[in-house]
Amino acid sequence: MREPETGPFLRRMKTSDLRAVMDIDARSLPKPWSEGIWRSELESPFALYLVLEEGDEIVGQIGVRNVLDELHVTNVAVHPEHRRRGHARVLIQAALSAYPDAGLVHLEVRPTNTAAVTLYRSLGFRETGRRPRYYGDEDALLMTLDLLAGRP
């Protein structure tokens, strides 16, 4: 008898997840974070890191830092074999919903990462500036989402 399939499952990231998370990071980013950076972020009281699991596999992650009433998305990555399934959208929406009183959400993205830029725009993020040579070889596109827009 086959076990019933379960959909994606979101949970807080643990240090025991770092091997899988760092693998996804390495497959997704030209300059992935070191284990030391990951451990430091997981220990921060101002950060929330979530993973998305399918079955027993971590397929994506997101990190958000909370500064007063603003959020900064520090990391979003989905395993290449699991992209284009809405996982990044689920991760972003889950992380933002953890902060119902947040006003603004900021992030940086490579302008050449057109899939991510398109996703962020579809979620309501707007371009607010650029950081020259932020990635060394490329500028960063600064994007902001106003969560207060439309609230009474």
Where are these regions (language model features)?
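Conserved beta-strand-loop-alpha-helix junction that forms the acyl-donor binding cleft
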Residues: P80, L107-V117, R133-D137
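Conserved acetyl-CoA-binding loop-helix of GNAT-fold acetyltransferases
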Residues: V78, R84-S97, V117-S122
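Terminal substrate-recognition subdomain of acyl/acetyltransferases
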Residues: M1-E3, A140-P152
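A short beta-loop-alpha structural element at the N-terminal edge
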Residues: G7-V21, D146
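Conserved active-site tyrosine of GNAT-family acetyltransferases
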Residues: Y120, F125, M143
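Conserved GNAT acetyl-CoA-binding A-motif
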Residues: A98-V109, R131
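Conserved beta-strand in the GNAT
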Residues: E57-R65, E70-A77
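A short helix-loop-beta-strand connector motif used in the catalytic cores of GNAT acetyltransferases and
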Residues: E41-V51, E70-H72
